[in-house]
C-alpha cells in the first residue's frame, strides 16, 4: 500500500466496516473464503471495542476460533506476569458467556510494538482474518505516519483485515 492510497483513505473514513486484502495475502485456493481463525486486536479504547461485535458475529457465523489480542509495551520481564494476568481477564470479560457454545475463544497478551505483535500472532496462528478498530479522530498527518498501527497491519498482514472506524 502506498502512502495516501485509496484503500487507506477508505478504511480511515468509511462509516461501515472495510475488508482490506493487502499485498501479502496469498491468492485463495478456492472460490469459497472461510474465516476459521479470527484475531480481534484491541487496545480497550471505545473505538477499538466497536470492532468486537463484528469479530464475534464472524466467529459465530463461520464456527471459527477467536483469539482476543492485546499488545502491551515492552516492560521488564518481572512485570510481564503481573500485567498479563489482569489483561487476560479483561480480554475474557469482553466475550459473552454463550460464546463458548459456538466458538473457541482464547486470550493472548503480548509485549511488543502493537503492529508487530498483531502481525506476529497472525503469522504464528495462520489467521484467516484480523479484526480491529481504527481511531476516527486521527489527524491526516498521523494517519499517514508509517508507524500508525492500522496502516502497518493492513500493509503487512498475511490475511485480510477488517477495520471498523471507532
Feature-to-residue mapping (PLM):
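Short, well-ordered secondary-structure micro-motifs
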Residues: 1, 30-31, 51-52, 78-82, ...
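Short, hinge-like loop/turn segments at secondary-structure boundaries
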Residues: 37, 83-87, 125, 148-150
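Gly/Ser-rich helix-loop-strand patches that form or flank binding pockets
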Residues: 1-27, 120-166
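Alpha-helical elements of Rossmann-like donor-binding domains used by nucleotide-donor carbohydrate transfer enzymes
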Residues: 54, 90-93, 117
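Charged docking surfaces used in two-component/phosphorelay signaling
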Residues: 109-117
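Hydrophobic alpha-helical membrane-association signature
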Residues: 6, 51, 87-91, 149
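Small/aliphatic-rich secondary-structure junction motif
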Residues: 33-85, 95-99, 104-108, 156, ...
Amino acid at each position: 500500500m502506498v502512502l495516501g492510497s485509496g484503500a487507506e483513505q477508505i478504511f480511515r473514513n468509511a462509516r461501515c466496516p472495510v475488508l482490506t486484502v493487502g499485498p501479502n495475502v496469498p491468492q485463495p485456493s478456492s472460490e469459497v473464503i472461510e474465516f476459521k481463525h479470527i484475531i480481534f486486536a484491541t487496545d480497550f479504547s471505545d473505538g477499538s471495542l466497536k470492532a468486537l461485535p463484528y469479530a464475534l458475529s464472524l466467529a459465530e457465523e463461520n464456527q471459527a476460533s477467536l483469539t482476543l489480542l492485546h499488545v502491551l509495551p515492552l516492560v521488564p520481564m518481572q512485570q510481564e506476569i503481573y500485567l498479563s494476568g489482569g489483561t487476560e481477564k479483561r480480554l475474557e470479560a469482553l466475550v459473552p458467556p454463550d460464546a463458548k457454545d459456538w466458538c473457541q475463544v482464547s486470550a493472548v497478551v503480548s509485549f511488543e510494538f502493537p503492529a508487530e505483535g498483531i502481525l506476529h500472532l497472525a503469522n504464528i496462528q495462520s489467521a484467516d482474518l484480523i479484526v480491529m478498530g481504527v481511531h476516527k479522530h486521527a489527524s491526516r498527518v498521523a494517519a499517514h505516519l508509517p508507524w500508525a498501527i492500522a496502516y502497518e497491519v493492513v500493509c503487512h498482514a498475511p490475511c485480510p483485515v477488517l477495520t471498523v472506524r471507532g
